[in-house]
Amino acid sequence: SQSDQPKKDDGTLTATAPATGQASNLTERNAQQRLIENLQKNFKTTNINVKVLEIKATEVPNIYWVNLEGMSPIYTTADGKYLIQGELIRLGDKTLHNVGEAFQSEISKKALASLKVEDLIVYPAKGKTKHVVYVFTDISCPYCHKLHEHMAEINAAGIEVRYIAWPRGDQFIPGMESVWCSADRKVAFDQAIAGAQLPPANCKNPVVDQYKLGQSIGVNGTPAIYN
């Protein structure tokens, strides 16, 4: 009989029969939208000028991962009243589990993919390129110096290195801009690493934008290496 035939799912949402899970997904989206609105309201009340880009539910009940414009991601409670800065770690396995790692990896990949190669300092691999790594660097950073000393052997191993400007403080911005404004950035970077004073920059450059991009994906020191 007709009643025995399986009913076609037309995607209609009802309060009583979320058979396909669409209704529960809609409820979750609505909850997340309310949370974004609550967060923005609370930020404004506290005189924090920041924009919420996206939020995602975590495996922890009532705890959400929040991606902010120009800032490192944070966590918040479901009511948007409490913020948690730093990593959220799950115990109980043989290794520690970073709850937000997958979310962070996703936005990092998108951010790095948005960079124009011509805005970077690129050290290509020797022979076949096996890997490409992105390095947020600063000419004043001692560990960046150490890494740079091994560039030839890194390239010889088939690894292409792409430097991104990340001045560690306002006082280091002019030096980084001088490198990025040079006709040959590699030569300028080598000279700056060696302690040379480069002439002041006088060009449109991506140094500050690259710094902000680094901040948005959680960079808080150099060298910060991503692949």
Please annotate each region the language model reported.
Residues 124, 129-203, 215-220:
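Structural alpha/beta surface segment adjacent to cysteine/selenocysteine redox centers
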Residues 1-132, 212-221, 226-227:
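Non-globular targeting/processing and membrane-anchoring segments
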